[in-house]
Amino acid sequence: MNKKPSKYFPSLNRTDYKNCNFLCNGFSLKPNEKKSSKNASMASKLLTTFFLIFFVLDIDLVATSMTSVSSAVEVLSDSGYLSMGLTLKLANQDLNLEDWQELTLFAPSDQSFSKFGQPSLLDMKYQLSPTRLPGETLRNLPNGAKIPTLRSNYSLTVTNSSRFGGKTSINNVVVQDSPVFDDGYVVIYGSDEFFTSPTKISDDSSSSSSIPSTTSSTGSIPIPSSATQTPPSPNIASDSTRNLPNRSKPVNRFNIFESASRLLMSRGFVIIATFLALQLEDNTSGNDTKITVFAPIDEAIPNPTTKFSDYVTIFRGHVVSQLLLWKDLQKFAKEGSILQTVLKGYEIEISLSGDILLLNGVPLIYPDLYVNDWIAVHGFNQMIVTKEKQVDVGDSITVLNNGEQEEEGVHGEYSSELGDYGLH
C-alpha cells in the first residue's frame, strides 16, 4: 500500500518526515517569525500613516485658517467691495485676524467709503465678530440680540423693525442676510453703511425703544471657545481725536490722513485714499516726516484683481517723503530735479513740456488737490511709472528716512507690510 505523501513534503514518506523533525522544527519557527515581523511592520506603517494623516490635516486646518482671510479679500474685491478688501488686507497686519478660527465681517460698499470716509482700526474692529454667523442664524436672531465684536466690551445690536421692510438690521443699518462669502470659517455680509459707533448707539438707546438697552433679557451671542487669542490692540487715535485738521500741528497725523482720504474718496481716488487712510501711526516717536502723494485715479490703475502686494507697491511708488506744493514742483521741474520715492531704489523725474508739468512723462492734472502743513496730494489721470535709480544721477533731491538717507540700490522684493506711516 502506498503511503500518502506528506502534506508539506510530498516527496518524503512518514518515516523520513519523522527523521527530519529537527529540520522541520527549525523551519517551523520561520513562519511565526515572518508573521511577527510582518505584524510589526504593518503596525509601524499604520502608525506612520496615522501621524502623516494627522500632520497633513493639521497643516490643512492651519492653511485653511490662514488663507480664509486672503480668500475673503479677493472675493470682496470681485464683489464690489474693493475698499473693504483693501482695508481688510492692510488692517489684518495689525489685527492678526488669522488668530481667530471663526470670523463674521460686515462689509460696507465702496459708496459708503466715499460717503463716510476710511474707518480707523478701532472702527474696523466694530465691523468684525469673532464668531461665525451663517445666513440662517443671522436671519433668525431676535430683535435686541447682541453680537460680540473684536472691539473689547462692545457688541452689535440686532435692530429689526418694520421700518426696514422686513430686512435684517444691525445697529439701525440694513445688512444683507445672504453672505457674500462663506468658507466655513469666515462669513462676510454686505451692509448699507458703517455701523454707528458704540457711543452714538448708547445715546440713541436712551431715547428710542427700537434699540434695547444693554440690560435687556434678550440673549447674547457668546464668543466661541475656539477664539482664545485676542489680537493685540494697535496704537491708534481715540474716537475723540478724529477731527478735521487745520493749519496748526495736529496731535497725531491720522487726523490729516483721514481728512485727505475723505477728499480723495469723493474725487474718484478710492484705491490711493484707502492706503492713505490706513497710515495710522501717531507722532509720539517725534517723527516729523512730511509727505507728498501723487494720486492716480482708480481707472488708471490696471486690473482691479491684481495682487494686493502690487497695490502696496503702486502706493509706495507714488509717495515721496517731502512736502511739495505746486510751486515747489514747478521750481524743481525747471531744475530737472529727481525725487526719490519711498519705494526704495525708484525715483521720479520732474520736467516741463511747455507749461505742463510732467512726472516721468505723466502730466499733472490736479495740482494741490489737498494741502496742509504735513501732506500734499496732487492728482493724475495716469499712473506714474517709477524708474530704477541710477548710480550717477547728478544733482538729485535727498530724501530722509527717519533722519537717515534712503538706502541705495534697486528695490528687489516688495513687502506688503507698511512701516511708520506705511511709507518705508
UniProtKB/Swiss-Prot annotation:
Gene3D superfamilies: FAS1 domain (2.30.180.10). It is found in: Membrane. Residues 56-194, 250-384 form the FAS1 domain. SUPFAM superfamilies: FAS1 domain. Residues 199-246, 405-424 are annotated as: Disordered. One of its GO terms (cellular component) is membrane. It is a single-pass membrane protein. Keywords: Glycoprotein, Membrane, Proteoglycan, Repeat, Transmembrane, Transmembrane helix. It comes from the Eukaryota. Pfam families: Fasciclin. Disulfide bonds: none annotated. InterPro entries: FAS1_dom_sf (IPR036378), FAS1_domain (IPR000782), Fasciclin-like_AGP (IPR052806). The chain crosses the membrane at residues 46-66. Glycans are attached at N153, N160, N246, N283, N287. Belongs to the fasciclin-like AGP family. May be a cell surface adhesion protein. PANTHER family: FASCICLIN-LIKE ARABINOGALACTAN PROTEIN 20-RELATED (PTHR33985:SF21), OS02G0491300 PROTEIN-RELATED (PTHR33985). This is Putative fasciclin-like arabinogalactan protein 20. It comes from Arabidopsis thaliana. The gene is FLA20.
